[in-house]
A protein has these predicted regions:
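Outer-membrane beta-barrel porins/channels
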Residues: 1-191
Length: 191
């Protein structure tokens, strides 16, 4: 906390080693390896008044450190080999903006937006049919209502705006597009 109104933060997560996906050892590079990539970021939150907080984060995801994600699909090595085809994703930097507003003691409403540069190039669409993660922009809305019984209900909604990547070169005609919607409801109880 820099001042009573402003907080700064930084994060770093190393690559997380996952067990081999044995059923996919002939598909994913490194005999079915599929680790979670390292990522790092910085953020700031400003308490505008007693009820309102605004926040901004910048995060970089290092897809290049995981061969099954980063290796280009144009490799001539066999599928599943250490240098075999992957999804061809580039590292990605994501900007996130958020706001939170407290209404009395019982209700908090939240909104957020994130945007990032496309990690999939237009010549890497073939292998990405399996995981067409092409969305660049997301909007989130949510709120938490505290109940008299010490319980709380949280509702959240996320919309990933439609994005398309049109294949080129050897992947001409293999086009990807995606949008997402997600709705969540959770109940919690405070002891």
């Amino acid at each position: 906390q820099v001042t009573p109104m402003v907080s700064l933060g930084a994060t770093y997560q190393t690559k997380t080693k996952m067990g081999k996906l044995d059923k996919y050892k002939g598909l994913f590079a490194e005999q079915g390896g599929f680790d979670i990539p390292a990522n790092y970021g910085v953020g700031i939150a400003a308490k505008i008044n007693d009820a309102t907080t605004l926040a901004a984060d910048v995060q970089t995801i290092q897809y290049s450190g995981v061969k099954s994600i980063a290796n280009p699909a144009s490799n001539t090595a066999p599928l599943g080999a250490d240098n075999g085809s992957g999804f061809g994703w580039s590292d990605m930097t994501v900007l996130k903006l958020g706001a939170s507003r407290q209404y009395g003691n019982d209700l908090v409403l939240r909104a957020g937006y994130s945007t990032g540069k496309q990690p999939i190039s237009d010549n890497q669409t073939f292998f990405n049919i399996l995981a067409p993660g092409v969305i660049e922009d997301h909007l989130t809305l949510g709120g938490t209502w505290t109940l008299a019984s010490k319980g709380e209900v949280t509702v959240s909604y996320m919309h990933g705006f439609k994005k398309a990547v049109t294949g080129s070169g050897a992947t001409t005609g293999i086009n990807l597009d995606m949008y997402q919607d997600s709705l969540g409801v959770a109940y919690g109880w405070k002891m």
